[in-house]
């Protein structure tokens, strides 16, 4: 696809710094009887008692141990994968707590996958319950703002010798927020290089919007205008977008009708 040098892209960001909102303390797509297992958080003394997810107020150069309780409510032995994942921002402008491949910006206070230790694989007999400790090692260097992530527990699908078929795979996610105080870092968003893209046969542009600070942003309005030789050919407004701390929102705009 040729990208005309006469095309001009204008991006306007209107944002509000909002309190961290994660939703329910534990989320899954079905109820326990359908999923076949349950997960619940076990808080420690650093927990904000007003929060239903892990919400920790910590000190630099310290260790914190939290835990989750996993119960196999099915009638079969099952294997589970546990992962602590850094929050990222998906292409829809929503904070994502499940993408283990997403990379945080270099400005992040610390990466959860490097500062946590826990048992990643567990096996439970039918009806068995197990507590899984998670140790957080807080770095020496103090930080303002927050580090966000999620504790993900996924039930593994047994290997089948039969013909491949569509099988539901279930996961629970418990939010994790780590702070060292109530002071927030300043808001700062930056837009990267505008590039042409073709996705599912549609042409458009993509531009990375970076949140370089350690604070989640919500109620974000993105206004974009695409012009050719001064004439507007596409205009779009996206409201109520979110960006995770120290993450990139891969914003895109299609100019096809």
Regions found by a protein language model. Name each.
Residues 68, 162-183:
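Short beta-strand elements
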Residues 41-74, 121, 189-200:
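Beta-sheet-dominated interaction scaffolds and their linkers
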Residues 62-71, 78-86, 92-94, 107-163:
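Ligand-binding face of N-terminal immunoglobulin V-set domains in extracellular IgSF glycoproteins
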Residues 182-257:
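Membrane-proximal extracellular "stem/stalk" segments
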Residues 2-28:
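Sec-dependent N-terminal signal peptides of Gram-positive bacterial secreted proteins and lipoproteins
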Residues 78-92, 96-105, 216-231:
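Short acidic, flexible loop segments centered on an aromatic residue
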Residues 101-141, 226-257:
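Intrinsically disordered, low-complexity Pro/Gly/Ser/Thr-rich segments with frequent PxxP/GP/PP motifs
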Residues 30-48, 178-188:
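Proline/serine/threonine-rich low-complexity linkers at boundaries of modular beta-sandwich domains
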